[in-house]
From Swiss-Prot:
One of its GO terms (molecular function) is identical protein binding. This is Protein LF2. Belongs to the epstein-barr virus LF2 family. GO terms for biological process: symbiont-mediated suppression of host innate immune response.
Length: 236
């Protein structure tokens, strides 16, 4: 078997493991979103554990691109955060979440279309790629990652018009005796997005730190369970 694969037995074993993982993914039922809606050329799909934003156009993602989701530039996507909000109680309970943008994609390599997750709102929490998120060739996907809000944590920079809602939500959680409901509902995702179309977004506060893309997106070889380091796969 080793002679049939370049690189010897180790490459052969890695190839068999990759084929087995792909066969399991094909058997996994397709997860359907709870809600989906369009904003311009972007399709937003809200799943129980994550939100997917897809643009089926082939884009050149740079700081001047006007077809990005609500965010001033690609470099700022990685540290941009929507207001804290409470999901539908029948689906998620009364937990509060914070979300952060992350984009990733490559046209010539299918493996690189798999999303990499960055968790800004909970430093000790390890975000995982949703098992049902399948790479699609020649599509650009943006993922919103959310996690339970940590009370007392220093908030990330917010757009000016949503910072007030974020502070109010955190304040009512920390100090419910100050009045109003303990679980004050902040603006929900569709309403907030409807006010901030791509290309017409508020600037982030001056001095807000934005992590360089090269420092945030990990190389493909560093992801556990995704095959051999440096191994390339071309789209079928």
């Amino acid at each position: 078997m080793a002679e049939a694969y370049p690189g010897g037995a180790h490459a052969a074993l890695a190839s068999r493991r990759s084929s087995f993982r792909n066969s399991l993914r094909r058997l996994r039922p397709t997860e359907k979103p709870d809600t989906s809606f369009m904003r311009g050329v972007w399709k937003y799909e809200i799943f129980p554990s994550y939100v997917r934003v897809t643009n089926k156009q082939v884009l050149q993602l740079d700081a001047q691109c006007q077809e990005l989701p609500p965010c001033p530039s690609v470099g700022q996507i990685l540290s941009f955060k929507l207001p804290s909000f409470s999901f539908n109680t029948t689906t998620y309970g009364s937990r509060y979440f914070t979300v952060a943008f992350l984009f990733f994609g490559a046209e010539d390599n299918e493996v690189f279309l798999k999303p990499f997750f960055v968790m800004h709102s909970a430093p000790g929490h390890r975000a995982k790629r949703p098992e049902s998120a399948q790479p699609v060739h020649r599509e650009r996907e943006v993922y919103l990652v959310h996690c339970a809000h940590q009370i007392g944590q220093e908030p990330l920079p917010l757009p000016a018009d949503s910072a007030r809602a974020e502070r109010h939500s955190a304040d009512t959680l920390l100090h419910p005796e100050r009045g109003q409901a303990k679980h004050q509902r902040a603006p929900d995702l569709p309403q907030w997005l409807s006010r901030h179309q791509p290309g017409r977004v508020p600037a982030l506060p001056a001095g807000a730190a934005h992590a360089p893309i090269s420092k945030v997106i990990r190389p493909y070889s560093h992801i556990p369970g995704e095959g051999m380091s440096g191994q390339r796969h071309t789209p079928r």
